[in-house]
Amino acid sequence: MKRLNLWAASLLLMLCAGMAHAELTIEITKGSDQAIPIAIVPMANGDDLPENVSRIVSNDLERSGRFEPLPRESLISRPSSSEEVHYQDWQQLDSDYLVVGKIDNQGGEYRIQYELLNVNGQNRMLGEVVTSSRDQLRDSAHYISDQIFEEITGIRGAFSTSIAYVTASGVGDDIDYALSVADADGHNSQQILSSDEPILSPAWSPDGGKLAYVSFETGRPGIYVQNLATGQRVRLTSFEGINGAPAWSPDGRKLAMSLSKDGQPEIYVMDIASRDLRRLTQSDAIDTEPEWAPNGRSLIFTSDRSGNPQIYRYDLGSGRAERLTFTGSYNSRGRFSPDGDAIFMVTRDDSGYHVARQDLDTDRMTILTDSDWDESPSVAPNGTMVIFATQEGTRGVLGAVSADGSASFRLPSPQGDVREPAWSPFLD
């Protein structure tokens, strides 16, 4: 399969045969050697519920790469509260932390009581009662995972966030495309748009309420914004040539994009309310894939003005662009870490295309993945993981890797091709 450079032309992406509306399932591919051992005891009264809260929490923490849940068969007892815990038993299992709890059904409303215990310190770190409806049990489990993750690591958990992605069904020239949104673990997939023309580059608004994307539904590319709550759609651009790579400003008032209406693809910024356009770059090269810095004062973008695709930074105050990447002959699709201290990108070496991280203070680049056909990285809002598209055999799947490369997992669809992932902001 020939690699298509999204930075180079009209952002056309031909997807292989697949399903347009299927939940993704997580497959852990690599665990971290520094993962923290934690025992998550099945919650009392929780086995017969439509969602296994304890198992969801265990899966969440494991795929973060920060934790290694003990296998259920190794648990020597099943306490449901801290009063029932014999800490020496769990010390023998080399577990640093212990999660216990119980679930009570109170007339169709579920009362989830959980505790996080420090095994070596023999003390309770966290305890809470969460009230949930039957339909919200999975959401409640993700919430509990977020609280445990933050209590131990000091980093806000991102298990209650969402991902957007593009799938396709059909073969040959008869392909149906779909834009879907799912929980960060691939469950609760909901299709928000279907089309017999390509859909590309989904991008979340800062408040998580809208998606911008590129659709070819009129026969040529246009940039659209869709309200996820109401389904209302607005077409913002449909110029001749390329209309691609929308990126929201941190305040949600502007979209950066790549347009070729004046010749070569250049970076523009649109004020969404007024539709006023401001052209930023002026070059004979291809400039595309803009991304706003978290502070809103600059953007990064991909350009081949040096002869090969590299990542540049455009300062909105001075109007100057500077090259950021010098390692290797191909670096594209730059994405900031939430703190703005690093960028994640696709880089090419002799073995293929990989997700990499570059520290902006030292300029040191680290390749994070060992797959050879990676593209479209998107960073979790807490900066701990990066989701991306890659190849598994002849199929496109989604992968994720920790920010330091120590842990990874895949989110393949049951069949078919999945592309263009975008991780949501925190959904408060």
From Swiss-Prot:
Task: Cite the residue spans of the region called Disordered.
Answer: 406-428
| One example of a Gene Ontology biological process annotation | protein import
Q: Which GO terms describe its cellular component?
A: periplasmic space
Q: Cite the entry's keywords alphabetically.
A: Cell cycle, Cell division, Periplasm, Signal
Q: Which InterPro entries match?
A: 6-blade_b-propeller_TolB-like, PD40, Tol-Pal_TolB, TolB_N
Please state the protein's primary subcellular location: periplasm
Instruction: Please list which residues make up the signal peptide.
Output: 1-22
User: Where does the record say this protein resides?
Assistant: Periplasm
Q: How does it assemble?
A: The Tol-Pal system is composed of five core proteins: the inner membrane proteins TolA, TolQ and TolR, the periplasmic protein TolB and the outer membrane protein Pal. They form a network linking the inner and outer membranes and the peptidoglycan layer.
Sum up the protein's function in the record's words. Answer: Part of the Tol-Pal system, which plays a role in outer membrane invagination during cell division and is important for maintaining outer membrane integrity.
Family according to the record = Belongs to the TolB family.
Alphabetical list of HAMAP family matching this protein: TolB (MF_00671)
Name of the protein described by the UniProt record: Tol-Pal system protein TolB
At the highest ranks, the source species' classification is:
Bacteria, Pseudomonadati, Pseudomonadota, Gammaproteobacteria, Oceanospirillales
Question: What gene makes this protein?
Answer: tolB
